[in-house]
């Protein structure tokens, strides 16, 4: 994918998606592209390490942070072959669905608008990740 800004804009055309980020996880654990001014632009290398690390038990019990926002994990198949998606929900009064998909070199992180069901984001992430995998990203 040459132009991530165009990709981010295309993803944000879906009115159910509030924020999006492309984050490296293989070579460079930082945000490659995101919605300007969005919460997901603040995803840290430490958060990427927790998401992709081998210790799944700890964050399944205690939750995790995405862009500094605390989340509870609903379903974790991020490291599973053939799936590669994690579903979570932010904590607090403004709870939103968060979905993380894994491609060979990058994570795709989506946050839905308030009231959008996580299953919708999950389906969208699966479709987008399939495209990223074909591109080799």
UniProtKB/Swiss-Prot annotation:
Biological processes, Gene Ontology terms: actin cytoskeleton organization; positive regulation of actin filament bundle assembly; regulation of actin filament polymerization
Keyword Nucleus in annotation: yes
GO CC terms: cytoplasm; cytoskeleton; nucleus
Keywords (A to Z) from UniProt: Actin-binding, Cytoplasm, Cytoskeleton, Lipid-binding, Nucleus
Single GO term (MF): lipid binding
InterPro entries: PFN (IPR048278), PFN_euk (IPR005455), PFN_sf (IPR036140), Profilin1/2/3_vertebrate (IPR005454)
Tissue and organ expression note: Testis specific.
Locations listed in the record: Cytoplasm, Cytoskeleton; Nucleus
Domain of life: Eukaryota
Complex formation: Interacts with ACTRT3.
Its job: Binds to actin and affects the structure of the cytoskeleton. Slightly reduces actin polymerization. Binds to poly-L-proline, phosphatidylinositol 3-phosphate (PtdIns(3)P), phosphatidylinositol 4,5-bisphosphate (PtdIns(4,5)P2) and phosphatidylinositol 4-phosphate (PtdIns(4)P). May be involved in spermatogenesis.
Similarity comment: family membership: Belongs to the profilin family.
Protein name according to UniProt: Profilin-3
């Amino acid at each position: 994918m040459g132009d991530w800004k165009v990709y981010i804009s295309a993803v944000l055309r879906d009115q159910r998606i509030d924020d999006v980020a492309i984050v490296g996880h293989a070579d460079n654990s930082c945000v490659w592209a995101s919605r300007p001014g969005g919460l997901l632009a603040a995803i840290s290398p430490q958060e990427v390490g927790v998401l992709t690390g081998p210790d799944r038990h700890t964050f399944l019990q205690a939750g995790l942070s995405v862009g500094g926002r605390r989340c509870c994990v609903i379903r974790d198949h991020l490291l599973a072959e053939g799936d590669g998606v994690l579903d979570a929900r932010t904590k607090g009064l403004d709870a939103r669905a968060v979905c993380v998909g894994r491609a060979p070199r990058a994570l795709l992180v989506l946050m839905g608008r308030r009231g959008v069901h996580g299953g919708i984001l999950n389906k969208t992430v699966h479709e987008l990740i399939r495209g990223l995998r074909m591109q080799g990203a």
